[in-house]
Amino acid sequence: MSFSVTVLGCSGVYQTRELAASGFLVEIDDGRWLVDMGGGTWRNLLLQADYRDLKGVFLSHRHPDHTIDIWQLFHARHYGDLGGPETKIPLWAPRETLDRLSHFDEGITESFDLLPVDQNSKVKFGGARATFARMKHPPETYGVRIEHGGVALAYTADTGIEGDIDAIARDAQVFLCEATVQDSDEPWWGHMCASDAGRIAVRSEVGRLVLTHLRPDCDRELSLQQARRAAPGLEVHLASDGMKLELG
């Protein structure tokens, strides 16, 4: 069994010179899936894998820092060198997100099967199972839990502490958790600080906490310190582009 996740982007709100916006490449046995496609993730994907090998894409919500590079993948599949009639791949997302994408360019349906998800959905990623939980964020947003071979990967997407985070995070070997702001910042509705991430990770008894979606003006090392103080003894890391985490 092989199961890994590679960070394609981890910057919150917008990409920077150093970091792409949110996106992850999930590899399970011989299959590859994308989870979110913020700005800059397309280029980073091409450094890691052949886009023709992708089996599907999940977009957590409609905000551009999680979706904008889906159009790069669409153009590559639609106008690129796949040759002949396209074989569609699944694009799972909240219905609101799918409606926005198809309204912008209805041609997207020629490259993707648009499949709405909600908190009751169960999806197969090859031999793995993906389940979803509603997060607390202004548009309809879902976090995802991917289970394979008795281990789990959890990703919050964007959320405040009121999101149904425990439903995806419990006992996860790797917990990709948003940490947009820091303890001293004004609260930002629909987002969390690094200490929140640490406390939730402890409560959910995760194996490793990986902080993602840090606002670009944050002191990243300070966020890491705050999360570690809230989660003593837990393995805590900062996400960085190209980081690969093995789960199996």
Language model features: what each stretch is:
Residues 161-244:
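Cap/insert and terminal regions of metallo-dependent hydrolase folds
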Residues 32, 39-88:
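Active-site metal-binding motif and surrounding structural segment of the metallo-beta-lactamase
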Residues 6, 92, 113-118, 131-133, ...:
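General small-molecule cofactor/ligand-binding pocket signal
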Residues 105, 115-171:
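Catalytic core of the metallo-beta-lactamase
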Residues 34-38, 55-62, 94, 153-157, ...:
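Active-site neighborhood of phospho(di)ester-bond hydrolases with catalytic His/Asp-centered motifs
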Residues 1-49, 140-157, 174:
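Conserved beta-strand hairpin/beta-sheet module of binuclear metal-dependent hydrolase folds
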